Regions:
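Redox-cofactor binding/interface segments in oxidoreductases and associated redox assembly factors
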Residues: 76-77, 98, 120, 225
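Feature captures the FAD/FMN-dependent oxidoreductase FAD-binding
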Residues: 39-88, 178-191, 196-199, 222, ...
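Residue-level detector of alpha-helix initiation sites
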Residues: 19, 124-126, 230, 268-269
Length: 289
């Protein structure tokens, strides 16, 4: 919106959330990105004349077809908000939640009872954000569960180091195989398969393989799954999608196969980006429009 407004376009943001900012507001914890700084950026965009429609969900409050008909160009920046599940026994037990869902609830100041012991599954930055947020919420034990070693973790080294300094317990070379409820029906334990590194995969990373007969169990009150996100694109009919349900767009022009509909950031071409990369994408897409 900022770059399009700079180029002299009339711009309208349509957002399902009550406040603007997307993943910057609801997916990045306060300690990493203070909301006061984000709000100043949004206020600047508003002063540039950008119209802002919040609490407006496509497919519920407005149809995608009507948006396409109303505007000369539509830029899809919907991100990847749907957490990927574990697909193991007990993964639907009360007390199991997605990493982005957890961070979003915290950003919206919703009450969450984590209990004293939390397991966070995953090795990326969202997993580190969830671990460090759980520590800040008062959890006495926070475990990070990752199926490879700490050297293979995709999270930034600084995030891993600071999580260690804050007391997060790293259970590397383990993979969840079951979540066990207690008498109250909520999460009570997580069962882990001990892993070892095998031969490299197609990307050169050594594959984690189970060590036969070796498992371990941790007592936990909450399990947070942060092994990746998917794009919720089912409401956008007529736009070509990848096998993973991400939007397909031309990497040079950022336009989809639907004329006048563009996409960028994590919602397209199965990309996984950090914030600054998505912003760079947005600048290129705005120039193309």
């Amino acid at each position: 919106s900022y770059f399009l407004a700079q180029n002299g376009h009339d711009v309208t943001i349509i957002d399902a959330m009550p406040k603007l900012g997307g993943m910057l507001r609801y997916g990045i914890p306060e300690y990493r990105l203070p909301k006061e700084i984000l709000q100043k950026e949004i206020d600047l965009i508003a002063k540039m004349g950008v119209k802002m429609e919040t609490n407006t969900k496509v497919g519920v409050d407005v149809s995608f077809e009507s948006i396409k008909n109303k505007y000369d160009a539509v830029l899809m920046t919907i991100g990847a908000w749907s957490s990927i599940g574990l697909h193991c026994k007990g993964d639907d037990t009360p007390g199991v939640m997605g990493g982005i869902d957890f961070l979003e609830k915290i950003a919206k100041s919703k009450t969450i009872n984590l209990g004293e012991s939390v397991a966070v599954v995953g090795g990326g930055n969202v997993a580190m954000d969830a671990c460090r947020t759980a520590v800040r919420m008062g959890a006495k034990k926070v475990y990070n569960i990752y199926r490879r070693t700490i050297k293979e973790m995709p999270a930034d080294e600084m995030e891993i180091r600071e999580a260690q300094e804050e007391g997060v317990r790293f259970e590397n070379l383990t993979n969840p195989i079951g979540i066990i409820p207690g008498e109250d029906g909520r999460v009570s334990k997580i069962e882990l398969q001990v892993m070892k590194l095998g031969e490299p995969d197609e990307r050169g990373r050594r594959r984690p393989v189970p060590v036969e007969g070796q498992t371990k169990v941790l007592d936990v009150d909450t399990v947070i799954i942060a092994i990746g996100q998917q794009v919720d694109s089912k409401l956008f009919d007529g736009i070509e999608k990848t096998r993973k349900n991400s939007l397909v767009y031309d990497p040079e022009t950022y336009m989809t196969a639907t004329k006048g509909v563009f996409a960028c950031g994590d919602c397209g071409n199965d990309k996984v980006s950090i914030a600054v990369e998505s912003i760079a994408d947005a600048r290129k897409a705005a120039d193309s429009i």
